[in-house]
Amino acid sequence: MSITPERKQALISEYGAKAGDTGSPEVQVAILSERISNLTEHFKSHNKDNHSRRGLLKLVSQRRSLLDYLKKKDEGRYKTLIGRLGLRR
């Protein structure tokens, strides 16, 4: 369910502005999207796992908040990010 440190570093290098950039909204949204997709796969075989489903809803809400913040601050970066991640908006 969690992502490996190697995968997290790959996401940071792909979406970050520089090597150690873990705080930018783009990196945070990319990491949350990876965790959300992992949990979605988990629910295909464990559909009664309601405890983890609550965690998934929290992750989706957190990602939504970060995307709203990014859209408010810089709409160009927002549109680029959702295009790169393949999010519907």
UniProtKB/Swiss-Prot annotation:
Q: Does the keyword Transport apply?
A: no
Which GO terms are recorded in the biological process aspect for this UniProt protein? translation
Question: Which residues form each disulfide bond in the chain?
Answer: none
Give the highest taxon in the source lineage: Bacteria
Listed GO CC annotations: cytosolic small ribosomal subunit
Q: What's an example of a GO molecular-function annotation for this chain?
A: rRNA binding
Describe the subunit structure.
Part of the 30S ribosomal subunit. Forms a bridge to the 50S subunit in the 70S ribosome, contacting the 23S rRNA.
What's the protein called, per UniProt? Small ribosomal subunit protein uS15
Origin species: Azorhizobium caulinodans (strain ATCC 43989 / DSM 5975 / JCM 20966 / LMG 6465 / NBRC 14845 / NCIMB 13405 / ORS 571)
Q: What are the leading ranks of the lineage?
A: Bacteria, Pseudomonadati, Pseudomonadota, Alphaproteobacteria, Hyphomicrobiales
